[in-house]
Amino acid sequence: MNFGNKIKCSICKKKIFLREKNLFFPFCSKKCKIIDLYQWISGKYKLF
């Protein structure tokens, strides 16, 4: 079955499908989504 293009989760680098029904997209899981949120809150990510 063809689900479309694959991308990598920006946190753990696991491959996920673009068209897959994923509540946590663009992350692969709730854990990766929370890790990303923490990185924003802690100041690791910055907008210039």
UniProtKB/Swiss-Prot annotation:
Family membership: Belongs to the DNA gyrase inhibitor YacG family.
UniProt-recorded name of the protein: DNA gyrase inhibitor YacG
Function: Inhibits all the catalytic activities of DNA gyrase by preventing its interaction with DNA. Acts by binding directly to the C-terminal domain of GyrB, which probably disrupts DNA binding by the gyrase.
Residues given in the record as Zn(2+) binding sites: 9, 12, 28, 32
A Gene Ontology biological process term: regulation of DNA-templated transcription
SUPFAM superfamilies reported for this sequence: Glucocorticoid receptor-like (DNA-binding domain) (SSF57716)
Gene for this chain: yacG
UniProt subunit comment: Interacts with GyrB.
GO molecular function annotation: DNA topoisomerase type II (double strand cut, ATP-hydrolyzing) inhibitor activity; zinc ion binding
Cofactor(s) of this protein: Zn(2+)
Species assigned in the record: Wigglesworthia glossinidia brevipalpis
Keywords: Metal-binding, Zinc
